[in-house]
A protein has these predicted regions:
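Helix-turn-helix DNA-binding segment
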Residues: 421-470, 474-479, 483-490
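General nucleic-acid-binding
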Residues: 350-419
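Internal alpha-solenoid helical repeat scaffolds
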Residues: 56-229
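Extended alpha-helical scaffolding segments used for macromolecular assembly and cargo binding
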Residues: 1-62, 83
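Amphipathic alpha-helical segments of tetratricopeptide repeats
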Residues: 33, 49-53, 85-96, 127-140, ...
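Alpha-solenoid helical repeat architecture
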Residues: 22-23, 60, 96-106, 136-153, ...
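Short coil/turn connectors between adjacent alpha-helices in alpha-solenoid helical repeat scaffolds
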Residues: 31-41, 71-82, 112-127, 153-169, ...
Length: 490
């Protein structure tokens, strides 16, 4: 009980297990911290699951909802569906819970998660949730789950050429339905998806205007997922415009907004946003370590959006001119994920492979992939993958293959190249200068001093050292000492 009061829930479960207090263990796993408890120590849950089974079905059925939610975000849908069907069957045959509409509504939310490859089915499931819930809202699921698919939500749901507008409209319905059952704000979602459509189809001015509008609408609403996604579009637009100072101001504001986030899904999403735009600029040292080193396990498990991680690493390989690795990344992006196709990453994969094959001297293959990319893009006018890779793609268009679609992209590519060049015009592209004290502090950091030693050398409190280090990291757009030192050396 002491451990529980101290919020040391894993210890509490261990002690309750020794005491064979299965009722209290079930209550912990059913409570508001149950899902996080399972996420932190799934093995412990499995070790007590059989013992709490009886009391769970008597009093705490939400234990299985929390476990099912955990499994739905960690495992392949085909591995989770048998468990889902088993639990649904248990509920339907249980004398207490079979007529509990609220419990069935929560199960339908989980079903919508498992249907993430089919937006139409997801919307149908959420309609049933409303029928079960009435005016009530989910007590289990937070609105940050909507971040599935962002940084570019359409990356996940756009699964057939010629259906982009239709998918955008379905996304609007899904977002509003999900917000309704999770007490989230419904403000701005229509405009957000309109901005995403504009971005994908190259209407940069409209994308920028709408993304800023939605950001302002939600900045005070604690609607973190839509804020992060708006910054993704805004920062990409600022690169296109070549607005360096506004870009770094945007990065700093995003850092301020997300600094205290603890939810893994949102942390990964924010790191994806910054990672991609930094990769576009070739600023590897500012990217999170897992993106720099192509370790995408968490990206895949947390938001089922491994393609965004691949696109980011591909951009980095373009900058580093590692054509063999770029070709491998492009190939991976073209492999169906969870038995479905994702058109936007597939197009980008074709573009990556066209660039890679051209630079490795295989013009026949380069032509095949660029034609494939155009074929998939033409009906919906998907042009952003070509624009953002225009610097490397330009010689392919000039020397291997072109057509009316590609010719129409040349003004966009020229504008994007100019934007990139404005960022690289001055070697020191960090507009935030360190103070005299911060410079002195960083000299000690580079020399290998510990924080306590720096405190003694500079005659300042340890907490002041830590505060100044945090300020330096923020100004440089990095997260640790090693990256800060690399930035200063550069």
């Amino acid at each position: 009980e002491v451990s529980e009061k101290r919020k040391s829930y894993i210890k509490a479960v261990a002690y309750y297990t020794k005491a064979k207090n299965w009722d209290r263990i079930a209550a912990l796993y059913a409570g508001k911290n149950g899902r996080r408890l399972i996420e932190r120590a799934p093995g412990i849950f499995q070790s007590v699951r059989e013992n709490i089974e009886e009391v769970m079905w008597e009093k705490y059925p939400t234990v299985m909802l929390n476990y099912l939610y955990y499994m739905s975000t960690k495992e392949n849908v085909h591995n989770v569906m048998p468990l889902y069907e088993e639990i649904i069957n248990d509920i339907n045959n249980h004398p207490i819970w079979k007529d509990n509409k609220f419990l069935m509504g929560e199960m339908m939310i989980i079903l919508s998660i498992l249907q993430f490859n089919n937006l139409e089915k997801m919307n149908q499931s959420l309609i049933k949730v409303r029928e079960y819930f009435g005016e009530r809202t989910s007590v289990i699921f937070g609105n940050s789950l909507l971040t599935y698919g962002t940084t570019c939500m359409t990356t996940l749901y756009y699964n057939k050429s010629g259906r982009l507008k239709e998918i955008i409209e379905q996304e609007k319905e899904y977002a509003k339905a999900y917000m309704r059952i999770t007490q989230g704000s419904r403000v701005g979602w229509d405009e957000f998806f309109d901005a995403e459509y504009a971005m994908i189809t190259g209407d940069i001015d409209t994308a920028y205007r709408l993304a800023k509008q939605v950001l302002l609408q939600n900045i005070l609403r604690n609607q973190t997922c839509i804020i992060i996604s708006c910054y993704y579009m805004i920062l990409k637009c600022l690169i296109y415009y070549g607005k360096k100072e506004e870009f770094y101001e945007g990065i700093e504001k995003l850092n301020e907004l997300t600094r205290d986030i603890t939810y893994p899904l949102l942390i990964i999403d924010a790191e994806l946003v910054q990672g991609y735009v930094y990769a576009c600029l070739g600023q590897q040292e500012k990217m999170s370590d897992w993106l720099q080193n192509f370790r995408l396990e968490n990206c895949s498990k947390q938001i089922r959006n491994i393609r965004s991680g691949c696109m980011t690493y591909g951009k980095l390989m373009c900058y580093k001119k590692d054509w063999a690795m770029l070709d491998m990344i492009g190939q991976q992006m073209m492999v169906p994920y969870e038995n479905t196709s994702h058109i936007y990453p597939f197009i980008t994969g074709c573009v990556y492979r066209a660039i890679a094959q051209y630079n490795m001297g295989n013009t026949t293959e380069a032509e095949r992939y660029i034609k494939w990319a155009v074929e998939l893009s033409y009906d919906d006018n998907v042009i952003m993958p070509f624009i953002e890779n225009g610097v490397e793609l330009e010689p392919v268009i000039e020397n291997v293959y072109t057509d009316g679609f590609l010719e129409s992209l040349k003004p966009y590519i020229a504008k994007y190249k100019a934007g990139i060049e404005s960022f690289n015009a001055v070697k020191d592209d960090n507009p935030y200068k360190l103070t005299k004290r911060e410079k002195e502090l960083m000299e000690y950091v580079k020399a290998g001093y510990k924080n306590s030693e720096i405190s003694e050398q500079m005659h300042i409190a340890l907490v002041t050292v830590e505060k100044n280090l945090t300020s330096v990291y923020r100004k440089l757009g990095v997260n640790n000492r090693t990256s800060a030192i690399m930035m200063l050396q550069k």
